[in-house]
Amino acid sequence: MSEENKQWSISDIEAIYQQPFNDLLYQAHTIHRTYHDPNSLQFATLLSIKTGACPEDCGYCSQSGHYKTHVEKEKLMSVEEVLQCAKEAKEGGAKRFCMGAAWRCPPDKAIPQLKEMIEGVKSLGLETCMTLGMLTKEQASHLKEAGLDYYNHNIDTSPSYYDKVVTTRKFSDRLDTLNNVRSAGINVCCGGILGLGETREDRIEFLLTLANMETPPESVPINRLIPVEGTPLAQAERVEGIELVRTIATARILMPKSAIRLTAGRTEMSDELQALCYFAGANSVFIGDKLLTEDNPQRFKDKTLFNKLGLTEMA
């Protein structure tokens, strides 16, 4: 079942997710080959442009002001600083430059500066993405005017489990922002995190929510939790690699046209596990040594692995 614009049911997705592993991989990889070059990856870079002191209480996040973590508060970077980082990202092979700020929602006074960042990064020939928290319709329109290509706003987990992870906002708040972004004509980047203490049923409901959006996200980041000392989820049980691959494969089947990004947690993955993820349908990664505040595989390690697998940069 890979029909586009299909409204999926929980039982549909359970049947896909829980089928024998080899059958799941075969189905996912067949669909992946139909819609994408199986030997190419999209390279993106993620920069924290405003770090720490976020008023939200996401139980996994190093940047929450509710917890004492290794992260130090840093003010919003200047346009010049951001553009220098964007130039370095382009030189390192990135095609998309993502800018993240630890806000509940961006202050209106910051919008002109954010628009300058977007315009400057686009002038370098890079695609632009931002993740700034919740957006109003007006703010989304301003970012679109500046030329923003993608906006990231993850739903994190299933609607049923969401309030076990975050209490300072509602799941519906996430959907409202996604609707504002979509209405403004900006492409949607939306995914979640595995390893928050959720069940397999939660992961299936999470995928159902994404796949049944009126227009599924153009980009779907799948993160494996990086436990952060000082946060409530610091001791969360690690999701097994096979479960990660099942989630990616199912996402590929449900959302055949979307880019599936293997995001946080790659530093803890073996080459073999990453290879399975790419075979299952992941076709986008963040390159560079940092993902906001956490470590990412060093460039030379990525280059070595991608060469072994015959994976090249997406045109």
Swiss-Prot record:
The reaction(s) this protein catalyses: (4R,5S)-dethiobiotin + (sulfur carrier)-SH + 2 reduced [2Fe-2S]-[ferredoxin] + 2 S-adenosyl-L-methionine = (sulfur carrier)-H + biotin + 2 5'-deoxyadenosine + 2 L-methionine + 2 oxidized [2Fe-2S]-[ferredoxin]
Cofactor note: Binds 1 [4Fe-4S] cluster. The cluster is coordinated with 3 cysteines and an exchangeable S-adenosyl-L-methionine. Binds 1 [2Fe-2S] cluster. The cluster is coordinated with 3 cysteines and 1 arginine.
Pathway membership, UniProt: Cofactor biosynthesis; biotin biosynthesis; biotin from 7,8-diaminononanoate: step 2/2
Enzyme Commission code(s) on record: 2.8.1.6
Sequence intervals crossing the membrane: none
Record-annotated Radical SAM core domain positions: 39-266
Keyword tags: 2Fe-2S, 4Fe-4S, Biotin biosynthesis, Iron, Iron-sulfur, Metal-binding, S-adenosyl-L-methionine, Transferase
Cofactors named for this entry: [4Fe-4S] cluster; [2Fe-2S] cluster
Positions of [2Fe-2S] cluster binding: C98, C129, C189, R261
GO biological process: biotin biosynthetic process
Listed SUPFAM superfamilies: Radical SAM enzymes
Family annotation (CDD domains): Radical_SAM
Reported function: Catalyzes the conversion of dethiobiotin (DTB) to biotin by the insertion of a sulfur atom into dethiobiotin via a radical-based mechanism.
Subunit-structure text: Homodimer.
UniProt similarity note: Belongs to the radical SAM superfamily. Biotin synthase family.
Protein name, UniProt field: Biotin synthase
Gene it is expressed from: bioB
